[in-house]
Amino acid sequence: MKVTALGNTLTGFGQALATTLGVDTTSSSPNCAEMMVVFARGTSEPGNVGLFSGPTFFDALEVMMGAGAVSVQGVEYGASIEGFLQGGDPAGSAAMAGIVEGTVQNCPNAKIVMSGYSQGGQLVHNAAAMLPAATMAKISSLVIFGDPNDGKPIANADPSKVMVVCHPGHNICDGRDLVLVEHLTYSRDAVEAATFAAARAKA
C-alpha cells in the first residue's frame, strides 16, 4: 500500500512538472513513418512516454531525421514500483512486444527503434526476449536510458544496434532501487542517443 501511494505521488508530481514545462507526455502515432519509435516510460512517469528522457529524445530524432519522418508509439502499462521490482511489468513487456510485432508487420519499410527509460528499459529487454529472432532482425536500433539491466545483453539483438546510456554511479544502473538526482538527468543524452539511432537507420 505504501509503495503504491508513493508511486501515485511521483506520477502526480511528474505530470504537474510536465504541465509546467509544456512537455507532451503522451504519444500514439499508428501511421507508418520513415522511423517508428516504440518507447516505454519509467516507473511512475506520466502519460505513456514519460518526461525525463522520451520527449527530448524524440525531438532530437525529429531534427536529425527531418520533419514528419519520426512516429512515436508509447507503451501503455502500469509503470508501478511493483513492476520494477519484478524486473519489468509483465503485461507491459507483452504489450511492447505486441506493438513491435504489429509495427514490423504493418510498416515493413520503416526503421524501427525499441527504446525505454528505467523500468521501460526492463520492458525492452523482456519484449526482445519474447519476440522471434526474425522480428528482432528487422529492428533498426535499441536505445535504453538508465537501464536497470545494465551489462546484460538484449536477447536476439545485434549488439551493434544497441546503445545503453548509464551515468557513472547511477544507483538504478548498478542494479539497486534508490532514485537519486542522476536518474532524472537523461534528457541531456538525447542528442547522442538520437545520433546513434539516426546513423543506424541510415546504415
Swiss-Prot record:
The record marks 119 as: Transition state stabilizer. Keywords: Disulfide bond, Hydrolase, Secreted, Serine esterase, Signal, Virulence. It catalyses: cutin + H2O = cutin monomers. Disruption phenotype: Abolishes penetration of the host cuticle. Abolishes conidiomata formation on the host. Induction: By contact with cutin. Catalyzes the hydrolysis of complex carboxylic polyesters found in the cell wall of plants. Degrades cutin, a macromolecule that forms the structure of the plant cuticle. Allows pathogenic fungi to penetrate through the cuticular barrier into the host plant during the initial stage of fungal infection. Belongs to the cutinase family. This is Cutinase pbc1. The lineage of its organism: Eukaryota, Fungi, Dikarya, Ascomycota, Pezizomycotina.
